[in-house]
Amino acid sequence: FTAEILCGTIALPIMLPALACSGIATLTAWIYLPAHATYLDIPQYRFSASLMIWALLAGPVLGLISAGYIRLIGWVSHHRAAGLKALFAPVLAFGILGVIGIWYPELFGNGKDMASDAFTGVGGLGLLLALSALKPLVTVLCLGSGASGGLFTPTLSTGAVLGGALGIAWNLAWPGSPAGAFAMVGAAAMIGAAMQAPITALALVLELTHSGFGLVVPMLAATVTATAVAFYVDGYSIYTARLPSRPPGWRSVLLTAQPHASPAAAADDAQHGRAEHPPEPGATGQARRAGG
């Protein structure tokens, strides 16, 4: 997570200390905490041709949905309740959540229980579709009201229920794979696309569940295609989209990059007084339109 998202590179000088710190932290945690997965009792799902084809087809769909989700997160982060509205917005937002929660109590909390149910195949098509639509909406509703909270688990749970729903629908045409397997693939794909970090997404789903090793190839296919589609749309992530002054999306940076655009080269340029201002988001397209 630190290397791929915060540092933006998986170079050896970063990976070695990161892995060493992770190993020490894990060994220390084993002394005081139970040595079990975050999501318990997840079956060891197996690879199937049906699941593989579904992953290739569902990846782009999940990527488009993730891109829309990222833009929604970005918009609401820049239009949060302020001033007098900040006193009443949380009451209204959580009141709405409470009413919806009468029918869908799975929406309460960060989504951990919702994801766990999806991973074990709990829930029918209608319920999973409803949750996959409502969870992002209540997340941005609470975020826009001024409430603080992380986005990792809500995003993972949304991908899980969405993957489960699409998988149940797929099973009507090509049965053979359990809904929980589709949920795990969907969770990895949406997390990878939303964070713009496919390696992190794959590793986290495997480690949080201690399962899914038979699904690595479908997970990889869905996660890579979903991340690529979301990247092509604008390249933002759920983290960069929330920044007060957003940098250009990675896609626009790469498409307009100079030969010295790498982080290491940029640091060298800054040291020698050669730093350049990055292009504003959309500046390239505006210049192109202005020029005809």
Where are the regions that the model predicts?
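Alpha-helical transmembrane segments and immediately membrane-proximal extracytoplasmic
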Residues: 1-292
